[in-house]
Amino acid sequence: MAEGERQTPSDSSEDAPPTTQNFIIPKKEIHTVPDMGKWKRSQAYADYIGFILTLNEGVKGKKLSFEYKVSEAIEKLVALLNTLDRWIDETPPVDQPSRFGNKAYRTWYAKLDQEAENLVATVVPTNLAAAVPEVAVYLKESVGNSTRIDYGTGHEAAFAAFLCCLCKIGVLRVDDQIAIVFKVFNRYLEVMRKLQKTYRMEPAGSQGVWGLDDFQFLPFIWGSSQLIDHPYLEPRHFVDEKAVNENHKDYMFLECILFITEMKTGPFAEHSNQLWNISAVPSWSKVNQGLIRMYKAECLEKFPVIQHFKFGSLLPIHPVMSSC
């Protein structure tokens, strides 16, 4: 989000002169395992992880019901996500022999593929219209794969990259931090859960019971940050059904736990072993630090995830610029 601090305000941007930056259509750059070194040294990696950690700090100790500023750009992003939600209602699952991967998802995705730039154009001011094709790629990448009808942390990362790009061009600002997580990302999660349930999407690259979650990772990071220094909720409480039911509307982490228990049967320790182990960690700050390390190791440093990440002018593959 620090990138956003250097941007000119977007409030009067409809009258501002067009930007002179050369935007490009993002493309894949990580083709083999040795290419992963390029990614870890890249400006894109530094900006992406910096964005995640800035938001992590911004929501620390705050409930979802915390009062925060909601800018016009935030409202427009929520409206965009509401449109995606409405399209799910308009595209019911079809009857098919296979239980998983309902083919109606491809119809839904084709609509997004066709309309993505128009949707992004409703969020981006006219003087930044040249950025729309580049930014829209990340939106299209963030909702799952239409060939495999699956969804995973790589798609979630594309949505975070989409938001990061909007910060870099100044559409989202430093004072939007809390709303980015609580209003936009939370709405995105709701829509993704609806997609997963409606079309019975497969988890992309799931590690089964040994993974943190079949589909998401970021809400566990930001959700654990929300719970740091909570007066009475400790990590051991998230495996307590009563504590989850009473507090899930205030905390993303607990909402994730509720969704898992709705979708899976059997003892929690068996279907979500990694989370069960985390419940034994003594403090939320330790949980938060551990999840950040795990996210880097299990998502950002894994070739099967990052091979699909796309790089453009806003999240470039070139090495981090050294500041002299």
From Swiss-Prot:
Where, by residue number, does ATP bind?
A: 148, 153-154, 304, 307-308
Keywords in alphabetical order: Acetylation, ATP-binding, Cytoplasm, Isomerase, Magnesium, Metal-binding, Nucleotide-binding, Nucleus, Rotamase
Tell me where it resides.
Cytoplasm; Nucleus
Q: Please list the residues that bind Mg(2+).
A: 208, 214
Q: Where is this region: Disordered?
A: 1-23
Q: How does it assemble?
A: Associates with the serine/threonine-protein phosphatase 2A PP2A(D) heterodimeric core enzyme, composed of a 36 kDa catalytic subunit (subunit C) and a 65 kDa constant regulatory subunit (PR65 or subunit A). Interacts with the catalytic subunit PPP2CA (via C-terminus). Interacts with PPP2CB.
Gene name for this UniProt entry: PTPA
The protein's superkingdom reads: Eukaryota
Q: Which Gene3D superfamilies match?
A: 1.20.120.1150
What is the recorded function of this protein according to its Swiss-Prot or TrEMBL entry?
PPIases accelerate the folding of proteins. It catalyzes the cis-trans isomerization of proline imidic peptide bonds in oligopeptides. Acts as a regulatory subunit for serine/threonine-protein phosphatase 2A (PP2A). Modulates PP2A activity or substrate specificity, probably by inducing a conformational change in the catalytic subunit, a proposed direct target of the PPIase. Can reactivate inactive phosphatase PP2A-phosphatase methylesterase complexes (PP2A(i)) in presence of ATP and Mg(2+).
The protein depicted here goes by the name: Serine/threonine-protein phosphatase 2A activator
* The keyword Transcription is annotated on this UniProt entry: no
Which Pfam families does this one have?
A: PTPA
User: A GO molecular function for this record?
Assistant: metal ion binding
Record's SUPFAM superfamilies? PTPA-like (SSF140984)
What Gene Ontology terms describe where this protein resides (cellular component)? cytoplasm; nucleus; protein phosphatase type 2A complex
* Coiled-coil regions, chain positions: none
What is one process in the GO biological process aspect for this record? Answer: mitotic spindle organization
Metal-binding keyword on record: yes
**Catalysed reaction(s)?**
[protein]-peptidylproline (omega=180) = [protein]-peptidylproline (omega=0)
Q: Residues where N-acetylalanine occurs?
A: 2
The record's comment on protein family reads: Belongs to the PTPA-type PPIase family.
Query: InterPro entries, from UniProt?
Result: Phstyr_phstse_ac (IPR004327), PTPA_C_lid (IPR043170), PTPA_sf (IPR037218)
Q: What class of enzyme is it?
A: isomerase
UniProt-listed Enzyme Commission number(s)? 5.2.1.8
